[in-house]
Amino acid sequence: MHHVADWKKEKVAELEDLTNSHEIIGIVNLADIPAKQLQTMRKSLGDNAILKMSRKNFIKIALENSDKEEVEGLADYLEGQPAMVFTKMNPFKLFKILEDSKTEAPAKAGSIAPADIVVPAGDTSFPPGPILGELQQVGIPAKIDKGSIVVTDDAKIVDEGEEIPKAVADILTKLEIHPMEVGIDLLAVCEGDTIYTADVLAIDEEETIQTLANAYQSAINLSVYAGILNSESAPLLIQKAARDALNLAINANILTSETTDKILSKAYAQMLAVAKLLSSEAIDDELNEKLNSQAAAAPVAVEDNTEEPEEEEEEEEDAAESAAAGLGALFG
Protein backbone atom coordinates (compact mmCIF):
# COMPACT_ATOMS: atom_id res chain seq x y z
CA MET A 1 0.00 0.00 0.00
CA HIS A 2 1.30 3.42 -0.97
CA HIS A 3 2.35 5.45 2.05
CA VAL A 4 1.24 9.11 2.20
CA ALA A 5 3.61 11.41 4.02
CA ASP A 6 2.25 12.92 7.23
CA TRP A 7 3.03 16.46 6.11
CA LYS A 8 0.81 16.00 3.06
CA LYS A 9 -2.06 14.78 5.23
CA GLU A 10 -1.58 17.77 7.51
CA LYS A 11 -1.65 20.21 4.59
CA VAL A 12 -4.90 18.74 3.25
CA ALA A 13 -6.45 18.62 6.73
CA GLU A 14 -5.62 22.29 7.29
CA LEU A 15 -7.35 23.28 4.04
CA GLU A 16 -10.36 21.11 4.94
CA ASP A 17 -10.70 22.74 8.37
CA LEU A 18 -10.48 26.24 6.91
CA THR A 19 -13.05 25.37 4.24
CA ASN A 20 -15.49 24.01 6.81
CA SER A 21 -15.07 26.98 9.17
CA HIS A 22 -15.48 29.85 6.69
CA GLU A 23 -18.56 31.17 4.93
CA ILE A 24 -16.72 32.37 1.81
CA ILE A 25 -14.14 30.22 0.02
CA GLY A 26 -12.29 31.45 -3.06
CA ILE A 27 -9.77 30.18 -5.58
CA VAL A 28 -7.05 32.60 -6.70
CA ASN A 29 -4.10 32.52 -9.09
CA LEU A 30 -0.74 33.75 -7.76
CA ALA A 31 1.29 33.12 -10.92
CA ASP A 32 4.02 35.65 -11.83
CA ILE A 33 3.67 37.68 -8.62
CA PRO A 34 7.04 38.72 -7.13
CA ALA A 35 7.45 37.81 -3.45
CA LYS A 36 7.66 41.45 -2.35
CA GLN A 37 4.42 42.41 -4.09
CA LEU A 38 2.68 39.29 -2.81
CA GLN A 39 3.61 40.30 0.73
CA THR A 40 2.13 43.77 0.14
CA MET A 41 -1.08 42.24 -1.21
CA ARG A 42 -1.36 39.96 1.82
CA LYS A 43 -1.18 43.06 4.01
CA SER A 44 -4.00 44.67 2.01
CA LEU A 45 -6.23 41.78 3.07
CA GLY A 46 -5.23 42.26 6.71
CA ASP A 47 -7.29 40.23 9.16
CA ASN A 48 -10.21 40.08 6.72
CA ALA A 49 -9.01 37.00 4.86
CA ILE A 50 -6.64 34.02 5.06
CA LEU A 51 -4.58 33.18 1.97
CA LYS A 52 -3.20 29.63 1.69
CA MET A 53 -0.94 28.48 -1.14
CA SER A 54 -0.86 24.76 -1.90
CA ARG A 55 -0.57 22.17 -4.64
CA LYS A 56 -3.48 21.67 -7.01
CA ASN A 57 -4.06 18.07 -5.94
CA PHE A 58 -4.02 19.05 -2.25
CA ILE A 59 -6.69 21.68 -2.91
CA LYS A 60 -8.80 19.22 -4.93
CA ILE A 61 -8.69 16.61 -2.16
CA ALA A 62 -9.55 19.21 0.49
CA LEU A 63 -12.56 20.39 -1.54
CA GLU A 64 -13.75 16.82 -2.13
CA ASN A 65 -13.42 15.91 1.57
CA SER A 66 -15.10 19.08 2.84
CA ASP A 67 -18.43 18.95 4.67
CA LYS A 68 -19.73 21.44 2.10
CA GLU A 69 -20.64 19.60 -1.10
CA GLU A 70 -21.11 22.81 -3.08
CA VAL A 71 -17.41 23.77 -2.82
CA GLU A 72 -16.33 20.81 -4.98
CA GLY A 73 -17.17 22.91 -8.04
CA LEU A 74 -14.28 25.25 -7.20
CA ALA A 75 -11.87 22.54 -8.38
CA ASP A 76 -12.83 23.45 -11.96
CA TYR A 77 -11.16 26.86 -11.55
CA LEU A 78 -7.67 25.81 -10.48
CA GLU A 79 -5.27 27.65 -12.81
CA GLY A 80 -1.66 28.78 -12.82
CA GLN A 81 -0.30 28.80 -9.29
CA PRO A 82 -3.50 28.25 -7.31
CA ALA A 83 -4.21 29.22 -3.74
CA MET A 84 -7.28 29.32 -1.51
CA VAL A 85 -8.69 32.37 0.21
CA PHE A 86 -10.99 32.15 3.23
CA THR A 87 -13.03 35.11 4.48
CA LYS A 88 -16.31 36.45 5.84
CA MET A 89 -16.40 39.32 3.34
CA ASN A 90 -19.02 39.17 0.61
CA PRO A 91 -17.55 38.04 -2.75
CA PHE A 92 -17.96 41.46 -4.39
CA LYS A 93 -16.03 43.24 -1.65
CA LEU A 94 -13.29 40.58 -1.75
CA PHE A 95 -12.98 40.94 -5.52
CA LYS A 96 -12.74 44.75 -5.24
CA ILE A 97 -10.01 44.61 -2.58
CA LEU A 98 -7.92 42.21 -4.66
CA GLU A 99 -8.40 44.27 -7.84
CA ASP A 100 -7.47 47.50 -6.04
CA SER A 101 -4.27 45.89 -4.73
CA LYS A 102 -2.98 45.15 -8.25
CA THR A 103 -0.02 47.16 -9.51
CA GLU A 104 1.41 48.02 -12.92
CA ALA A 105 4.28 45.92 -14.23
CA PRO A 106 6.59 46.07 -17.26
CA ALA A 107 5.88 43.84 -20.24
CA LYS A 108 7.90 40.67 -20.74
CA ALA A 109 8.56 38.91 -24.03
CA GLY A 110 5.83 36.34 -24.58
CA SER A 111 3.35 37.94 -22.16
CA ILE A 112 -0.25 38.26 -23.34
CA ALA A 113 -1.48 41.85 -23.66
CA PRO A 114 -4.36 42.41 -21.18
CA ALA A 115 -5.62 45.28 -23.37
CA ASP A 116 -4.61 47.17 -26.51
CA ILE A 117 -1.13 48.61 -25.96
CA VAL A 118 -0.93 52.18 -27.26
CA VAL A 119 2.12 54.43 -27.24
CA PRO A 120 0.84 58.02 -26.98
CA ALA A 121 2.12 60.85 -29.14
CA GLY A 122 4.57 63.21 -27.48
CA ASP A 123 8.16 63.91 -26.52
CA THR A 124 10.06 60.80 -25.35
CA SER A 125 12.85 62.89 -23.75
CA PHE A 126 15.39 60.67 -25.55
CA PRO A 127 18.14 62.45 -27.50
CA PRO A 128 18.74 61.46 -31.14
CA GLY A 129 20.25 57.99 -31.34
CA PRO A 130 19.64 54.31 -32.14
CA ILE A 131 16.36 54.29 -30.22
CA LEU A 132 14.75 56.21 -33.09
CA GLY A 133 15.23 53.19 -35.34
CA GLU A 134 14.00 50.84 -32.58
CA LEU A 135 10.78 52.83 -32.27
CA GLN A 136 10.16 52.82 -35.99
CA GLN A 137 10.98 49.12 -36.22
CA VAL A 138 8.09 48.16 -33.91
CA GLY A 139 5.65 50.45 -35.71
CA ILE A 140 5.90 53.63 -33.63
CA PRO A 141 6.01 56.77 -35.83
CA ALA A 142 8.83 58.93 -34.48
CA LYS A 143 11.14 61.72 -35.57
CA ILE A 144 13.72 64.13 -34.20
CA ASP A 145 12.30 67.49 -33.17
CA LYS A 146 14.21 70.24 -31.33
CA GLY A 147 16.95 67.92 -30.17
CA SER A 148 14.82 65.03 -28.90
CA ILE A 149 12.89 62.08 -30.27
CA VAL A 150 9.15 62.67 -30.57
CA VAL A 151 6.34 60.17 -31.21
CA THR A 152 4.26 61.93 -33.86
CA ASP A 153 0.97 60.01 -33.49
CA ASP A 154 -0.66 57.60 -31.06
CA ALA A 155 0.41 54.10 -32.09
CA LYS A 156 -1.30 50.82 -31.19
CA ILE A 157 1.50 48.27 -31.32
CA VAL A 158 -0.14 45.21 -29.72
CA ASP A 159 -3.79 44.15 -29.78
CA GLU A 160 -5.53 42.83 -26.69
CA GLY A 161 -4.94 39.09 -26.30
CA GLU A 162 -1.85 39.02 -28.53
CA GLU A 163 1.60 37.92 -27.45
CA ILE A 164 4.07 40.74 -26.81
CA PRO A 165 7.25 40.38 -28.93
CA LYS A 166 10.64 40.88 -27.25
CA ALA A 167 11.44 44.01 -29.29
CA VAL A 168 8.14 45.59 -28.22
CA ALA A 169 8.64 44.61 -24.57
CA ASP A 170 12.11 46.18 -24.60
CA ILE A 171 10.96 49.46 -26.13
CA LEU A 172 7.98 49.72 -23.75
CA THR A 173 10.34 49.32 -20.80
CA LYS A 174 12.58 52.09 -22.17
CA LEU A 175 9.55 54.35 -22.56
CA GLU A 176 8.47 53.45 -18.99
CA ILE A 177 5.14 52.16 -20.25
CA HIS A 178 3.98 49.32 -18.02
CA PRO A 179 0.99 47.63 -19.68
CA MET A 180 0.84 44.56 -17.47
CA GLU A 181 -0.94 44.14 -14.15
CA VAL A 182 0.47 42.14 -11.28
CA GLY A 183 -1.87 40.96 -8.59
CA ILE A 184 -3.96 38.20 -7.10
CA ASP A 185 -6.49 37.01 -9.66
CA LEU A 186 -9.71 35.88 -8.01
CA LEU A 187 -10.98 33.08 -10.27
CA ALA A 188 -14.08 31.87 -8.40
CA VAL A 189 -15.79 32.22 -5.02
CA CYS A 190 -18.27 29.94 -3.30
CA GLU A 191 -20.91 31.48 -1.02
CA GLY A 192 -23.64 29.17 0.20
CA ASP A 193 -24.86 27.17 -2.79
CA THR A 194 -23.56 29.65 -5.37
CA ILE A 195 -20.22 29.86 -7.15
CA TYR A 196 -19.38 33.32 -8.51
CA THR A 197 -16.81 33.63 -11.29
CA ALA A 198 -14.62 36.68 -11.88
CA ASP A 199 -16.74 37.97 -14.78
CA VAL A 200 -19.80 38.06 -12.51
CA LEU A 201 -17.95 39.85 -9.71
CA ALA A 202 -16.43 42.47 -12.04
CA ILE A 203 -19.25 45.00 -11.99
CA ASP A 204 -19.55 48.76 -12.41
CA GLU A 205 -20.31 49.84 -8.83
CA GLU A 206 -21.84 53.24 -9.63
CA GLU A 207 -24.04 51.85 -12.39
CA THR A 208 -25.18 48.92 -10.25
CA ILE A 209 -25.97 51.12 -7.24
CA GLN A 210 -27.93 53.52 -9.46
CA THR A 211 -29.85 50.62 -11.02
CA LEU A 212 -30.72 49.23 -7.58
CA ALA A 213 -31.70 52.70 -6.33
CA ASN A 214 -34.02 53.16 -9.32
CA ALA A 215 -35.54 49.73 -8.75
CA TYR A 216 -36.02 50.56 -5.06
CA GLN A 217 -37.77 53.83 -5.91
CA SER A 218 -39.98 52.11 -8.49
CA ALA A 219 -40.94 49.43 -5.97
CA ILE A 220 -41.85 52.10 -3.39
CA ASN A 221 -43.97 53.98 -5.94
CA LEU A 222 -45.76 50.78 -6.95
CA SER A 223 -46.49 49.77 -3.35
CA VAL A 224 -47.84 53.25 -2.56
CA TYR A 225 -50.11 53.44 -5.63
CA ALA A 226 -51.29 49.85 -5.12
CA GLY A 227 -51.87 50.38 -1.40
CA ILE A 228 -49.46 47.59 -0.39
CA LEU A 229 -48.41 48.02 3.24
CA ASN A 230 -44.83 47.31 4.25
CA SER A 231 -42.18 48.94 6.43
CA GLU A 232 -41.12 51.28 3.61
CA SER A 233 -44.52 52.25 2.19
CA ALA A 234 -46.53 52.49 5.43
CA PRO A 235 -45.37 56.03 6.39
CA LEU A 236 -46.05 57.28 2.85
CA LEU A 237 -49.46 55.62 2.71
CA ILE A 238 -50.42 57.10 6.09
CA GLN A 239 -49.36 60.57 4.90
CA LYS A 240 -51.35 60.10 1.70
CA ALA A 241 -54.40 58.91 3.63
CA ALA A 242 -54.14 61.92 5.94
CA ARG A 243 -53.98 64.32 2.97
CA ASP A 244 -56.91 62.61 1.24
CA ALA A 245 -58.98 62.69 4.43
CA LEU A 246 -58.22 66.37 4.96
CA ASN A 247 -59.15 67.23 1.35
CA LEU A 248 -62.38 65.24 1.63
CA ALA A 249 -63.35 66.95 4.88
CA ILE A 250 -62.66 70.40 3.41
CA ASN A 251 -64.62 69.73 0.21
CA ALA A 252 -67.50 68.21 2.19
CA ASN A 253 -67.46 71.13 4.68
CA ILE A 254 -66.94 68.83 7.67
CA LEU A 255 -65.80 71.04 10.55
CA THR A 256 -62.93 69.74 12.70
CA SER A 257 -59.97 71.31 14.46
CA GLU A 258 -57.94 70.61 11.30
CA THR A 259 -60.44 71.88 8.74
CA THR A 260 -62.27 74.83 10.29
CA ASP A 261 -59.75 77.50 9.26
CA LYS A 262 -59.42 76.04 5.77
CA ILE A 263 -63.20 75.79 5.25
CA LEU A 264 -63.66 79.40 6.39
CA SER A 265 -60.87 80.48 4.03
CA LYS A 266 -62.55 78.55 1.22
CA ALA A 267 -65.93 80.13 1.99
CA TYR A 268 -64.35 83.57 2.10
CA ALA A 269 -62.67 82.98 -1.28
CA GLN A 270 -65.96 81.75 -2.75
CA MET A 271 -67.75 84.82 -1.41
CA LEU A 272 -65.20 87.10 -3.08
CA ALA A 273 -65.51 85.11 -6.33
CA VAL A 274 -69.29 85.64 -6.35
CA ALA A 275 -68.85 89.33 -5.49
CA LYS A 276 -66.59 89.77 -8.52
CA LEU A 277 -69.48 88.76 -10.77
CA LEU A 278 -71.64 91.58 -9.44
CA SER A 279 -71.46 95.20 -10.44
CA SER A 280 -69.70 97.56 -8.06
CA GLU A 281 -73.01 99.30 -7.39
CA ALA A 282 -74.51 96.06 -6.02
CA ILE A 283 -71.96 95.67 -3.22
CA ASP A 284 -70.95 97.91 -0.35
CA ASP A 285 -67.72 99.86 0.02
CA GLU A 286 -66.16 97.38 2.47
CA LEU A 287 -66.55 94.49 0.02
CA ASN A 288 -65.27 96.64 -2.84
CA GLU A 289 -62.18 97.39 -0.78
CA LYS A 290 -61.58 93.69 -0.13
CA LEU A 291 -61.90 92.91 -3.85
CA ASN A 292 -59.37 95.61 -4.68
CA SER A 293 -56.98 94.30 -2.01
CA GLN A 294 -57.28 90.76 -3.39
CA ALA A 295 -56.48 91.95 -6.92
CA ALA A 296 -53.35 93.72 -5.68
CA ALA A 297 -52.17 90.65 -3.73
CA ALA A 298 -52.86 88.14 -6.53
CA PRO A 299 -49.34 88.22 -8.13
CA VAL A 300 -47.73 87.51 -4.74
CA ALA A 301 -50.01 84.50 -4.22
CA VAL A 302 -48.97 83.05 -7.56
CA GLU A 303 -45.28 83.39 -6.67
CA ASP A 304 -45.80 81.63 -3.32
CA ASN A 305 -47.59 78.70 -4.95
CA THR A 306 -44.74 78.03 -7.35
CA GLU A 307 -42.41 77.20 -4.45
CA GLU A 308 -44.42 74.21 -3.18
CA PRO A 309 -43.58 71.75 -5.97
CA GLU A 310 -39.87 72.50 -5.46
CA GLU A 311 -40.12 71.37 -1.85
CA GLU A 312 -41.77 68.11 -2.92
CA GLU A 313 -39.04 67.51 -5.51
CA GLU A 314 -36.35 68.08 -2.87
CA GLU A 315 -37.99 65.50 -0.60
CA GLU A 316 -38.01 62.93 -3.43
CA GLU A 317 -34.32 63.62 -4.19
CA ASP A 318 -33.40 63.18 -0.51
CA ALA A 319 -35.20 59.83 -0.44
CA ALA A 320 -33.39 58.64 -3.57
CA GLU A 321 -29.99 59.73 -2.19
CA SER A 322 -30.64 57.91 1.09
CA ALA A 323 -31.52 54.74 -0.80
CA ALA A 324 -28.37 54.95 -2.93
CA ALA A 325 -26.18 55.51 0.14
CA GLY A 326 -27.58 52.40 1.80
CA LEU A 327 -27.06 50.30 -1.31
CA GLY A 328 -23.45 51.42 -1.55
CA ALA A 329 -22.69 49.39 1.59
CA LEU A 330 -23.20 46.21 -0.46
CA PHE A 331 -19.84 46.76 -2.14
CA GLY A 332 -17.85 47.95 0.84
Swiss-Prot record:
Residues 294-332 are annotated as: Disordered. InterPro entries: Ribosomal_protein_uL10 (IPR050323), Ribosomal_uL10 (IPR001790), Ribosomal_uL10-like_insert (IPR040637), Ribosomal_uL10-like_insert_sf (IPR043164), Ribosomal_uL10-like_sf (IPR043141), Ribosomal_uL10_arc (IPR022909). Residues 304-320 have a biased composition (Acidic residues). The keyword Ribosomal protein applies. The keyword rRNA-binding applies. One of its GO terms (biological process) is ribosomal large subunit assembly. Gene3D superfamilies: 3.30.70.1730, 3.90.105.20, 6.10.140.760. GO terms for molecular function: large ribosomal subunit rRNA binding; structural constituent of ribosome. GO terms for cellular component: cytosolic large ribosomal subunit. Keywords: Ribonucleoprotein, Ribosomal protein, RNA-binding, rRNA-binding. Part of the 50S ribosomal subunit. Forms part of the ribosomal stalk which helps the ribosome interact with GTP-bound translation factors. Forms a heptameric L10(L12)2(L12)2(L12)2 complex, where L10 forms an elongated spine to which the L12 dimers bind in a sequential fashion. Forms part of the ribosomal stalk, playing a central role in the interaction of the ribosome with GTP-bound translation factors. Belongs to the universal ribosomal protein uL10 family. This is Large ribosomal subunit protein uL10. It comes from Methanosphaera stadtmanae (strain ATCC 43021 / DSM 3091 / JCM 11832 / MCB-3).
